[in-house]
Amino acid sequence: MVDVNRFKSMQITLASPSKVRSWSYGEVKKPETINYRTLKPEREGLFDEVIFGPTKDWECACGKYKRIRYKGIVCDRCGVEVTRAKVRRERMGHIELKAPVSHIWYFKGIPSRMGLTLDMSPRALEEVIYFAAYVVIDPKDTPLEPKSLLTEREYREKLQEYGHGSFVAKMGAEAIQDLLKRVDLAAEIAELKEELKSASGQKRIKAVRRLDVLDAFNKSGNKPEWMVLNILPVIPPDLRPMVQLDGGRFAASDLNDLYRRVINRNNRLARLLELNAPGIIVQNEKRMLQEAVDALIDNGRRGRPITGPGSRPLKSLSHMLKGKQGRFRQNLLGKRVDFSGRSVIAVGPTLKMYQCGVPREMAIELFKPFVMREIVAKEYAGNVKAAKRMVERGDERIWDILEEVIKEHPVLLNRAPTLHRLGIQAFEPVLIDGKALRLHPLVCEAYNADFDGDQMAIHVPLSEEAQAEARLLMLAAEHILNPKDGKPVVTPSQDMVLGNYYLTMEDAGREGEGMIFKDKDEAVMAYRNGYAHLHSRVGIAVDSMPNKPWKDSQRHKIMVTTVGKILFNDIMPEDLPYLQEPNNANLTEGTPDKYFLEPGQDIQEVIDRLDINVPFKKKNLGNIIAETFKRFRTTETSAFLDRLKDLGYYHSTLAGLTVGIADIPVIDNKAEIIDAAHHRVEEINKAFRRGLMTDDDRYVAVTTTWREAKEALEKRLIETQDPKNPIVMMMDSGARGNISNFSQLAGMRGLMAAPNGRIMELPILSNFREGLSVLEMFFSTHGARKGMTDTALKTADSGYLTRRLVDVAQDVIIREDDCGTDRGLLIRAITDGKEVTETLEERLQGRYTRKSVKHPETGEVLIGADQLITEDMARKIVDAGVEEVTIRSVFTCATRHGVCRHCYGINLATGDAVEVGEAVGTIAAQSIGEPGTQLTMRTFHTGGVASNTDITQGLPRIQEIFEARNPKGEAVITEVKGNVVEIEEDASTRTKKVYVQGKTGMGEYVVPFTARMKVEVGDEVNRGAALTEGSIQPKRLLEVRDTLSVETYLLAEVQKVYRSQGVEIGDKHVEVMVRQMLRKVRVMDPGDTDLLPGTLMDISDFTDANKDIVISGGIPATSRPVLMGITKASLETNSFLSAASFQETTRVLTDAAIRGKKDHLLGLKENVIIGKIIPAGTGMARYRNIEPQAMNEIEVIDHTEVSAEAVFTAEAE
């Protein structure tokens, strides 16, 4: 076997007959499988041991040679080689076909490769191959056309007319093989190239297609006649096994049935030929053989599929590769692994951030080999077998050993569905009793886990390297930030939020107000003994907290705070300011001066003067965590998070916040509001009956009335709510629920959607406290059911979107430090009409500048070129009034097969500059796909009938953008740059005409009458600007403008959809995806290169081809950029392994084989498929060959020395 980590590329070609013979270990002549009495394989049958190797290790078939010492001997009695039984997975056989047979992939695929090679229609081919017509191979001196078809009758007539032997015509695959042998590739290619110079229309398209196939054969060295088989390989028997079931019956792979039919028909054909049977019988047998081989290769591709028992179609070789259950996706990309287990999860509130609880019996099974090794090392048992028995008996001593073994040995926890990389994290195991895994409550958000019965899987990294990577790169305490937006993903939730909210509340006039304490301990003592309340405002000596960053003016004073806040601040990192107010000013600039007593001032006076602060809510805690991370990085942050969690749980327990029906308030003026609404609706209906409004207007007015009534109730609810009400506290703190839940409990449920999505006019007037009537209950079931079905559909859609995104971007890896490009991207805030969807500050953070940025007024240089823009710098730039900045962007990066560090910027998951080897493509795909389920499914109608455009939003719009489809409600765009001179309406055709005067000429655009205009007369418009509301069709924009403007447009559109749903995603992720959609060009004119016109190729390959020609002084080729949807882009990737494992497996492999494609294994997927370590992260070539050395022996290498990775050309290493 070849070592998988040594080879660098993998090629697929057509197999020549000699190649098939060289693979084969013998011919399979009989259809028999195994003998039903002896259960031994039959000689010369499909499981023959002579051909395929022994069924038992080191043992021949007759038993003369047993044991390993006879290795390599071929038995003289039975002819079987003594070797390992696993050769039955590798050795192939063959069948000598008595008549040539066409390969169905090349004849039936679209486009038919055989048809293109011979310039015959697939229909004609089918008639010849399946013996319905003769084809003229060599007309000799007769006036017959070569390749023309003759029916049986015409053939006989022509024979009589011209005499026997005057021309050659045959039928069946044999005829096709003769024709293919006669194809002169070089001559045909030259002819087609000539034809292309003049041809146009359909003729040109066909010529380009034929040229493509012929050129592929010419360059790859494959011969066209190999598309017809004379010899059929038989795959190894262990890949099509036959196993005995209980009860003596056998279960065999379908392939055995299919092979058996081929062999039967082939043998019968041989006998008929020997007997010189009549032509028609032989023909029929040849046709049946052809059909049998077709079924074996791809059952069901042509005609009715061959069925097994119970009319189930048999699974052919093609089906073994295809689809989710096929070889690629089931066994190569998704293997089951050893050392794993799964169990229900329960909450582990006492765990540290980096720990998880593992049940004892699970741990002993997972760590069995480690425990056994220790048992032997400690000499509790003499050998491994005895140690194993000890573990299985459950000896008392194994538990102490287990404790030792798992110390510092991280395990991985995974929850399905793994939507982003935070779905697998590493923890240190802690042994617990019970049978459920214990999970730290703060990592739940990353996993999207809850404890209502979720299950999780646990995996053990075995090797030292795997453990090191798990500990350093995957430990849960390291994953504070979410890779999609760089915001903390471990924010406290529910009880923890509630506890800290209650703790930081302030209240006037509670016991102990105005007391002054010398330090924290005294304050806590007073609180514990009932002298001071948590919420009462008290004084504390500032000097008792010397490590806090006080201003000089604040030292040696007394500060007014609450006992709760003293406890709250006690867990904060030392260098953070003392937090009094839940706002960013206090967090970043320090405690406000108004809380400090001047010498001799009365504390009660100050307390009375101060406003009562609102408590700290979930959002404020999130900000504190983000600030902590920014200042102190992961270790301190995770320790702080644990303290926050413990404090929150402790105080939410102490507070004893409960919910009863009496906690839901009654709104005093509900009846008045509802009566007023009824009255208004009555008036609207009256007006409608009088004909003063249309039915649509009435519907809109009625629904608006009820919506306003609901809002009025909500407003009243907020005005009258008691801040100490537990439900209000839960809602206000962000622990659970929101105002809409609250208003359904206390206000009214309001309008409901009918099953067709239209909103019903009858609202639900009751709330849950009063209870719903039967009719109201019935109405509300529509909405509930729609919610459930929508969610289910959305999950599947979103999952498929993620899969396509991952596939198209999986080979984008950070390959080098700096690509040295001189291009950049000009960015400004993204706006949607008047609203800003993404501010400039957000877009600048963590990117490198392309040019220096100057202050617009003073002209001072704020930041130089090629510098990293930090959060503070971004704020400084925006505050200076700069509106647009040119940055380094993924769009303009010049790195091949990836991106460079400077064009990418910081890694959002760590907040530091991205490292070479980071798989940014996969991260981008996950970041866009993971929030997919939060997007809505609906296609909105804009407020009734105002416009005729349906605006697609949510998930369908994202799919529309990434698949580069023509959008619904397309906008009209201008092709000329200039001014709008007039807009005239034409009532007869119900259209408007827009005239744009450019420098070169006048552009005239017809838009529908109802379309909303975006421009007015006198407006200046650029090329590609939208004249009407709606989405621009990106392919059209690409024709009118350039690649960069299309990329910018797509980026802005994706961001609009996500931001409108309140989901933040870093620009760079969208940039990576959009760049992949635009990485191909189509060759228009080949110039002096040997490219073919109409070929799709990578931009980098195209530039290379041109570079050589320009250097030698020739004419370079010209090309056009092509925008491809992500599905198409994945299938057009350079790696055939990646494309085949994605979709349309047979088509991809057919095409790759004809071209003799080489897969250079640059992406992640290809390497996973062949079982090689992936070329990202620590698997990159530059990191693979580093030998570990002791720190003092060598100077630490400067990181820039390691950063410039050459993108290697792939051949044998």
From Swiss-Prot:
Cofactor: Mg(2+); Zn(2+)
Domain of life of the organism encoding this protein: Bacteria
Single GO biological process annotation from the record: DNA-templated transcription
Keywords: DNA-directed RNA polymerase, Magnesium, Metal-binding, Nucleotidyltransferase, Transcription, Transferase, Zinc
Details of cofactor binding: Binds 1 Mg(2+) ion per subunit. Binds 2 Zn(2+) ions per subunit.
Binding site for Zn(2+) 1: 60, 62, 75, 78
GO MF entries: DNA binding; DNA-directed RNA polymerase activity; magnesium ion binding; zinc ion binding
Record keyword DNA-binding present: no
Binding of Zn(2+) 2, residues: 819, 893, 900, 903
Recorded catalytic activity of this chain's protein: RNA(n) + a ribonucleoside 5'-triphosphate = RNA(n+1) + diphosphate
Keyword Nucleotidyltransferase attached: yes
Binding site for Mg(2+): 450, 452, 454
EC number: 2.7.7.6
Any one annotated GO CC term: DNA-directed RNA polymerase complex
Annotated PANTHER family: DNA-DIRECTED RNA POLYMERASE (PTHR19376), DNA-DIRECTED RNA POLYMERASE SUBUNIT BETA (PTHR19376:SF54)
Subunit structure, as described in the record: The RNAP catalytic core consists of 2 alpha, 1 beta, 1 beta' and 1 omega subunit. When a sigma factor is associated with the core the holoenzyme is formed, which can initiate transcription.
Similarity annotation: Belongs to the RNA polymerase beta' chain family.
NCBIfam families: rpoC_TIGR
Function field: DNA-dependent RNA polymerase catalyzes the transcription of DNA into RNA using the four ribonucleoside triphosphates as substrates.
Identification of the protein by name: DNA-directed RNA polymerase subunit beta'
Native source organism of the sequence: Streptococcus pyogenes serotype M28 (strain MGAS6180)
UniProt lineage: Bacteria, Bacillati, Bacillota, Bacilli, Lactobacillales
Gene name for this UniProt entry: rpoC
